[in-house]
Regions:
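ATP-dependent helicase/translocase motor core
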Residues: 1-185
């Protein structure tokens, strides 16, 4: 079956020693001398109608409560053309949870060998976030997983600090869906 052949080849390309999800997204794959592009980048201009048409054919999708094993589920996974590229653990400060809980969850409950989290072959980035702050890791490695802040910073000049600005009419992490998690970024 063609679909099974493509999936098998894709998995092989992403999991081999010098392979990666990023590489197959950037360069596509070749099967039986046929190039298969897995992502079309945004053209620099609108002059090339075909390049723009192909870019607009990319399919971005979001799944919530993605089951990754009998006992595990991830809050959100974002896909590009069917390939998982971002995982997110979301916590609500009002429920007395924070991004710290999401980081702990990634470090202690997520198996780095799981296909979704496998370094270079799984999601490109894993976000731990609450309503105020966002942290990211590109490699899950159990307790050794290192998370970096993915915040805008708060304040300006010598008053600048960590975290995000506080807004009256939206969440401090609204930049994630307004600016970061958009088709063009």
């Amino acid at each position: 079956k063609t679909e099974d052949t493509v999936i098998s080849f894709l998995n092989t390309e992403m999991t081999k020693e010098r392979g990666s999800l990023l590489n197959v997204l950037k360069n596509g794959i070749e099967i039986s001398n046929q190039k298969l592009n897995l992502l079309y980048r945004k053209p620099a201009t609108t002059f090339n109608k075909e390049a723009n048409r192909l870019y607009n054919e990319n399919i971005f999708s979001v799944m919530e409560e993605v089951v990754i094993s009998d006992k595990e589920r991830i809050d959100l996974v974002i896909f590009v053309n069917g390939l998982a590229v971002i995982s997110m653990e979301l916590k609500c400060n009002h429920a007395k949870q924070s991004y710290h809980d999401a980081i702990t969850q990634y470090r202690t409950e997520r198996d780095p060998k799981n296909r979704l989290f496998r370094f270079k072959a799984g999601c490109l980035v894993n976000f731990a976030m609450d309503l105020d702050e966002v942290y990211m890791a590109t490699k899950l490695d159990g307790e050794s997983t290192f998370f970096l802040p993915f915040n805008m910073g708060n304040g300006t000049g010598i008053e600048a600090g960590a975290g995000n600005p506080i807004f009256k009419d939206k969440y401090s992490v609204s930049y994630m869906w307004e600016d970061i998690l958009t088709k063009d970024t």
